[in-house]
């Protein structure tokens, strides 16, 4: 029910939202006044090594574009949240070979890139992808492992209390005034 949730936690889900502003507005409706939202999601440096390989091969990006943390903060404010705090970190994953990297990427989820290949690809594509990754991977560790970056964006904000409209003359009941004083 609207206004019934005191804390909303969304871990690694927001970047999958097709319409993030609509989702943030929905969160705003669910939260009670002074409710707290906290989330993590992927940021724009995610899969940068893989995108570099795709670009070198002349392929479209391997995944949809991820939203920058500053834009998430702006969207929180635009949807009525207060005091947004944003942060990010980069995590580097290491894989022994391209097959392990591909398998891990498949387990992560879906690809919303509108330019992705429209049909399923066969064994020939899988072999070509493995070969291109093996031959053109930009960042290998000294022991030969494939390093893949994930940018993790963290954010939290509050749903502010409803404010009283201020006009040339404003009326506030005694009970409302007491409630305002108690909350300070």
Q: What are the residue ranges of the model-derived segments?
A:
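Short catalytic micro-motifs in class I SAM-dependent methyltransferases
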Residues: 12-15
